[in-house]
């Protein structure tokens, strides 16, 4: 117990899209993971307006922070730092989280850590499977991202090996669900139908898998078009669309390419661990095929539980705790939200506080020695 | 599509609104990618569906490209301010996918491109593009350069 008490206690705030997430972790131990579905399913179905999402974050922010602290059974005064997603994401939505994090950090006299949303998606696995192996190969797949990333140190070195050149994997699921009239979001419902379908019923194309194609980039736009056309032809012929087979065959095409490229990247780079994160990591077929192919290649697969794969505050807290543990410089008070923060920047250190500066934090909150919150 | 986008870049200037329509997979994002190359803007032009809108700043001194997918927007956009973008629209080239009935109020002047692809399970990769210029801005503009 004494040991774990020495680990950094960090609160993390995530508002990059339409979930307001607040998590509390101590080192690599999850204490609380509060998520306010700021935009309910009904509203999501009708669509999302960024300005509306920002307002919803604003309303949910303080109650969600209070809930997370209560759930964790800790006092805000005991925190060692406040971490927040600084980007990438929706500009206005990010701004709400960043502003809240600054206000709490300043009032409490705690260091502030602006961190990268994608690096957080990787680091969250520490809460599930313990410290990340170094290096770690990560496949991040969600509605907004599809990337292969190699990290030797999640707080300072994340290298993009490849990414989608058109649609994200999760987006392809949403769009095909739209064509099949299955509703939004498309991932879970296609997963469900696919379980009763034949993944080999229809040979849909595997994008960017030719010998001269970029080895680690993805493309799902051509697949999307091929599936849409196949469905159109069935409908035009007055035939019934076999939803289960289309779902299974489409899903197979997506997860085949994702897992094939991820395993290849591991082999090429000599990495024996693969972590999969992001909302699409909840897909049952992706998990199964990744497991099968990783086992065959002697690679250890790490996939966090679904609730930690989708956007949440715990992942931000996990990366924040790692920043504290590794003595990374805190962010300045003028930290801004950056909707296109590059994946190569795991966090946004303050100016004039080099990485690893042992007293980085102290400088940053000199202005707030008084604890205004208590 | 990509080449058409590059040619389109030569016609456009700050403040212009381009509306793209066409089936899923018609090539709207591909055309926009060519447009981005033609305008010389930063970043890979990928689908903006998830983030609704993405801003690509110019690498030179040209206008930034604002790429919008209006599909998930629930109602009309009375004001583009609702998108929370940190650029001025009158200084940008704006491309909107799935914007019919949603963004017309933004400006009288707009260039409409409708991309038609063969429907059904076919190897027919030909796309037909119908270009319509609306408003004063396009009344006298020569869009024939798009035909190459």
Swiss-Prot record, chain A:
Residue stretches in coiled coil: none
One GO term describing the cellular component: cytoplasm
Top-level lineage group: Bacteria
InterPro entries registered for this protein in UniProt: ATPase_NBD (IPR043129), Gcp-like_dom (IPR000905), KAE1/TsaD (IPR017861), Peptidase_M22_CS (IPR017860), TsaD (IPR022450)
Signal peptide extent: none
Cofactor note: Binds 1 Fe(2+) ion per subunit.
Keywords assigned: Acyltransferase, Cytoplasm, Iron, Metal-binding, Transferase, tRNA processing
EC top class named in words: transferase
Biased composition annotated in UniProt, kind: Low complexity: 337-352
Region Disordered: start-end pairs: 337-374
Protein name: tRNA N6-adenosine threonylcarbamoyltransferase
Main location: cytoplasm
Residue positions binding Fe cation: 117, 121, 311
UniProt-recorded Gene Ontology molecular function terms: iron ion binding; N(6)-L-threonylcarbamoyladenine synthase activity
Record's function text: Required for the formation of a threonylcarbamoyl group on adenosine at position 37 (t(6)A37) in tRNAs that read codons beginning with adenine. Is involved in the transfer of the threonylcarbamoyl moiety of threonylcarbamoyl-AMP (TC-AMP) to the N6 group of A37, together with TsaE and TsaB. TsaD likely plays a direct catalytic role in this reaction.
UniProt biased composition (Basic and acidic residues): 359-374
Binding site for substrate: 140-144, 174, 187, 191, 283
Catalytic activity, reaction form: L-threonylcarbamoyladenylate + adenosine(37) in tRNA = N(6)-L-threonylcarbamoyladenosine(37) in tRNA + AMP + H(+)
Species annotation: Streptomyces coelicolor (strain ATCC BAA-471 / A3(2) / M145)
Required cofactor(s): Fe(2+)
Curated annotation (Swiss-Prot), chain B:
Keywords: ATP-binding, Cytoplasm, Magnesium, Metal-binding, Nucleotide-binding, tRNA processing
Positions with a binding annotation for Mg(2+): 29, 97
Pfam families xrefs: TsaE
GO molecular function, one term: ATP binding
InterPro entries in the cross-refs: P-loop_NTPase (IPR027417), T6A_TsaE (IPR003442)
Record's keyword annotation contains Lyase: no
Function: Required for the formation of a threonylcarbamoyl group on adenosine at position 37 (t(6)A37) in tRNAs that read codons beginning with adenine. Is involved in the transfer of the threonylcarbamoyl moiety of threonylcarbamoyl-AMP (TC-AMP) to the N6 group of A37, together with TsaD and TsaB. TsaE seems to play an indirect role in the t(6)A biosynthesis pathway, possibly in regulating the core enzymatic function of TsaD.
Lineage: superkingdom: Bacteria
Example GO BP: tRNA threonylcarbamoyladenosine modification
Family to which the UniProt record says this protein belongs: Belongs to the TsaE family.
Binding locations of ATP: 25-30, 125
Gene for this chain: tsaE
Protein name: tRNA threonylcarbamoyladenosine biosynthesis protein TsaE
Organism: Streptomyces coelicolor (strain ATCC BAA-471 / A3(2) / M145)
GO cellular component: cytoplasm
Location of this chain's protein in the cell: Cytoplasm
